Amino acid sequence: MELAVGAGGMRRSASHTSLSESDDFDLSRLLNKPRINVERQRSFDDRSLSDVSYSGGGHGGTRGGFDGMYSPGGGLRSLVGTPASSALHSFEPHPIVGDAWEALRRSLVFFRGQPLGTIAAFDHASEEVLNYDQVFVRDFVPSALAFLMNGEPEIVRHFLLKTLLLQGWEKKVDRFKLGEGAMPASFKVLHDSKKGVDTLHADFGESAIGRVAPVDSGFWWIILLRAYTKSTGDLTLAETPECQKGMRLILSLCLSEGFDTFPTLLCADGCCMIDRRMGVYGYPIEIQALFFMALRCALQLLKHDNEGKEFVERIATRLHALSYHMRSYYWLDFQQLNDIYRYKTEEYSHTAVNKFNVIPDSIPDWLFDFMPCQGGFFIGNVSPARMDFRWFALGNMIAILSSLATPEQSTAIMDLIEERWEELIGEMPLKICYPAIENHEWRIVTGCDPKNTRWSYHNGGSWPVLLWLLTAACIKTGRPQIARRAIDLAERRLLKDGWPEYYDGKLGRYVGKQARKFQTWSIAGYLVAKMMLEDPSHLGMISLEEDKAMKPVLKRSASWTN
């Protein structure tokens, strides 16, 4: 069955065709470049932090090389290329794959005659459009990966350049101006039928629930730029002055010095995929994992010129501190749980083991039964006197893909998923967080949010889009059978249910009470998962191998009362 459809086969969304001469500025010359050769080429390397020179030496370009890649036939191998998925199918694809591609192409948004992205949902049955007719940066990532894997990189190129253009806009919420490097949460194409001109309207958080700026958008943009570069072998886009400046602006926001004593990023609730009040304020695992991955991607993409060299050095320093902090204080397994259970409190000195003064009585009862003897995960949040022990899927999957998790920790996360399959996978992969909060805690944490009731939406709902992240993590850890089992579950329901945004219930059995149908990232997430499972070399565009220069986590002795 032929999956690849040329650009001429793309279907336009009638209200999203676009044209605007004045919005392009000097980026128009980049957009109008001839199509690159899609044939996969040798790409650049995951550079070790030990290669970073602090002596002032360097060179003007990024470095070439190979990435270590998982091979089903035997351990690690080098990624030479990622051919279009449709070219090397070893077996007949599932019947719903064709429907998925058709639905994905229906969601395409066009600007100036060129495909620019995909809208969040193409649900004609819904009376309220809300913001589901916009192109969200985080939502487009699985769509972009699907097109890259299918040999259609121009869509991704246009998206990267247009969002870069939007980054340069003045950004205000009420009378307050946002940082120059902030990327939009989403944008919309507005068509003026009388003038025949289309314009872009970006949202930097001023229209979002709670008016929170998206911290993750800039990280996803850098990660996607690397994926594009890995997939095509084309370094010219990343090395343009515009892309180099865009990365530096994003990094300036998150590498700036302040009052923090931690290398993690302090964030407000609702700043990421969980975009409503869910108690993730502070130092959420999702943001820290994306931050880590974006730093490692930027380390590969930044030039070692006068402007880039300073950032390369700052990134290397931050990565060392961040990896140690996350692996030491966010990691939880059976032994660490037992240690925390026996912690002393009120320790004043540099020798304190309970550095955050976590009260053992604050450990929730559910955790003792949930934690298996074999397995572990990165908890949701760590800050003074507070540990959020909930499981968050996206942060843990990104931790594996970015190698924030050590190989042993990555294996333990997979062990946990297998041991707690009913809780984390159920009947529809994958729980966005576990467990759900309810009753009085729900009222306090969510502010009585009617959308985030227990086992619904972000409060323990099941999100099919996470399937691509699970599959990538499974392939990287050599456990593709877990992904195959999860995909089999999803294929039983997704098309029949109309590609819902999320599922409700403890097992993920019911279509979400407010879930949009034909949710684009549910569709794209499934396609990416299928293509990666059929051709694991695709993993190279979204996975980073472990950097040996990062020191392993130091074993800490437990603190307890005799």
From Swiss-Prot:
The keyword Kinase belongs to this UniProt entry's keyword annotation: no
Coiled coil feature spans: none
Catalytic activity reported: Hydrolysis of terminal non-reducing beta-D-fructofuranoside residues in beta-D-fructofuranosides
Keywords: Carbohydrate metabolism, Cytoplasm, Glycosidase, Hydrolase
Subcellular location: Cytoplasm, Cytosol
One Pfam match: Glyco_hydro_100
Keyword Hydrolase attached: yes
Broadest EC class assigned to this enzyme: hydrolase
UniProt protein name: Cytosolic invertase 1
Organism: Oryza sativa subsp. japonica
Annotated gene: CINV1
